[in-house]
């Protein structure tokens, strides 16, 4: 009975459910990344940091759609592009971690050296900043890196988006 009521609600207001699910999953994904970084002290590589941006975009898009109470085809296309770009970035990062492709210049250090510093200051700057390689995952759970979990999550989001868009609407 509860499941039937839930399914009827989803059929009736599928776009509100889509936005709420996207916001919730994005917050959970970002929270997981920040907990790993700031509580467990795993330093993210540059690609790991870039993989957070699509979730921030999904939160902004979904909140905007909820506030204006309108979800048109352009909003759905923007959500689709955001999730697809996250899939592409996660796939590339996974390939870099597994050695299938070479890391690009994006994977270089995020440390910027100001002009006019002495060698001692530059050494001190490098040794005080943790540098993480894009080729070595910081965490692996069951042999799968966080990047690959991110890819799986984004594939699930694509499937969910497809179900919301193409599942027959209720006539009630």
From Swiss-Prot:
MF annotations from Gene Ontology: protein-disulfide reductase activity
Keyword Protein biosynthesis included in the entry's annotation: no
Entry GO CC: plasma membrane
One GO-annotated biological process of the protein: protein folding
Keywords: Cell membrane, Membrane, Transmembrane, Transmembrane helix
Transmembrane segments: 20-40, 48-68, 76-96, 146-166
Keyword Kinase in annotation: no
Localization terms from the record: Cell membrane
Membrane topology label: Multi-pass membrane protein
Protein name: Uncharacterized protein RP370
Species per Swiss-Prot/TrEMBL record: Rickettsia prowazekii (strain Madrid E)
């Amino acid at each position: 009975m509860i499941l039937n009521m839930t399914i009827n609600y989803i059929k009736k207001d599928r776009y509100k459910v889509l936005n709420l699910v996207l916001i919730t999953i994005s917050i959970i994904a970002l929270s997981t990344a920040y907990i790993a970084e700031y509580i467990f002290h795993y330093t993210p590589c540059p690609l790991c940091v870039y993989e957070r941006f699509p979730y921030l975009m999904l939160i902004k898009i979904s909140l905007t759609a909820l506030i204006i109470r309108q979800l048109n085809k352009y909003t759905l296309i923007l959500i689709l592009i955001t999730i697809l770009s996250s899939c592409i970035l996660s796939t590339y990062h996974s390939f870099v971690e597994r050695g299938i492709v070479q890391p690009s210049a994006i994977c270089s250090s995020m440390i910027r050296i100001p002009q006019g510093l002495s060698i001692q200051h530059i050494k001190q700057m490098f040794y005080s900043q943790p540098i993480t390689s894009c080729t070595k995952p910081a965490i692996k759970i069951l042999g799968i890196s966080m990047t690959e979990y991110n890819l799986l999550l984004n594939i699930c989001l694509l499937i969910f988006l497809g179900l919301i868009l193409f599942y027959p609407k209720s006539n009630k």
